C-alpha cells in the first residue's frame, strides 16, 4: 500500500509516504514509514545542464565525506563550470544537502555524485545505513518495492541466485515503482533503530536505449 500526504494509516508493515511538499520529508520519522518521496519541478536551466552532462561521454564520480558548513558546493565538477546552469545545479545540490543535514541534525555527510551507464545494484536489497537520500537528476530513477508485497526471505542469498522476478521476492509486480527524476527520496536502512527488519527495498533500474545513462546523488550520515 502507498499512502499520500492526505491519508496515513499505521499498518503492521512499513509504507511509503508520497508528497509534493518538502516539509513532508519529516514523515520519515514515523515508525510506520520506511520511504518518503517528494516529487518536485525544477527550472529548465538546471534540467538543460543535467541533459548536457548525460550526453557527454566522460564519466562523473565524486565521493567525499564533507562538512556542510565549510564545503564549497560551487567547486563541484569544476570542469563543467563554464556550462549554462552550472550554478543552478550546485545550488540545488547544496539545498538538498542542507535539507538532509537539518532533518537529521548532521554536520557531516557522505556525498556521492556520479553518472551510471549500467545498473550498479540490479537486485532488490536493503542498505546497511541509517537513512539515505537519493535523487536521480537525470535518466531513469531508482526502483523501490512496497513492503507489503515483498517476501523478505528472498533478499540476498535467499534468492537462490534467481532474479527478483523469479525468486518469489516480488508478490505483486504492480508494487514495483520508479522514483521520478529530481524527486527527493529518503530510504530508511537496516541501521535505523527499530526499523532493522523493515529497511526500504530498492534497486538500480535497468537502463534503456532511449535513456542509457543516469546522474545520481546520494547522501549518507557522515563519520
Segments from the language model and where they lie:
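Catalytic core of Fe(II)/2-oxoglutarate
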Residues: 168-223
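Active-site environment of non-heme Fe oxygenases that use a 2-His-1-carboxylate facial triad
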Residues: 113-115, 137-151, 201-204, 216-223
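Short helix/loop capping segments that flank catalytic or ligand/cofactor-binding pockets
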Residues: 46-47, 144-146, 188, 195-196
Amino acid at each position: 500500500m502507498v499512502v499520500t500526504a492526505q491519508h496515513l494509516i499505521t499498518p503492521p508493515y512499513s509504507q511509503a509516504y508520497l508528497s509534493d511538499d518538502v516539509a513532508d520529508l519529516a514523515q520519515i520519522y514515523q515508525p510506520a514509514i520506511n520511504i518518503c518521496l517528494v516529487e518536485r519541478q525544477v527550472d529548465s536551466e538546471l534540467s538543460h545542464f543535467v541533459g548536457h552532462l548525460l550526453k557527454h561521454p566522460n564519466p562523473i564520480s565524486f565521493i567525499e565525506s564533507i562538512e556542510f558548513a565549510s564545503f564549497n558546493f560551487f567547486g563541484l565538477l569544476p570542469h563543467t563550470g563554464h556550462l549554462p546552469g552550472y550554478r543552478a545545479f550546485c545550488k540545488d545540490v547544496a539545498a538538498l544537502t542542507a535539507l538532509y543535514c537539518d532533518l537529521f541534525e548532521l554536520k557531516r555527510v557522505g556525498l556521492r555524485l556520479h553518472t551510471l551507464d549500467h545498473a550498479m545494484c540490479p537486485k532488490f536489497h536493503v542498505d546497511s545505513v541509517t537513512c539515505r537520500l537519493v535523487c536521480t537528476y537525470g535518466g531513469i530513477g531508482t526502483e523501490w518495492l512496497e513492503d507489503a508485497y515483498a517476501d523478505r526471505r528472498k533478499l540476498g542469498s535467499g534468492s537462490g541466485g534467481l532474479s527478483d522476478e523469479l525468486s518469489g521476492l516480488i508478490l505483486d509486480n504492480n508494487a514495483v515503482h520508479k522514483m521520478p527524476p529530481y524527486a527527493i527520496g529518503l530510504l530508511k536502512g537496516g541501521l535505523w533503530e527499530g526499523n532493522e527488519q523493515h529497511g526500504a527495498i530498492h534497486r538500480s533500474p535497468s537502463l534503456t536505449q532511449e535513456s542509457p545513462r543516469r546522474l545520481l546523488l546520494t547522501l549518507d550520515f557522515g563519520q
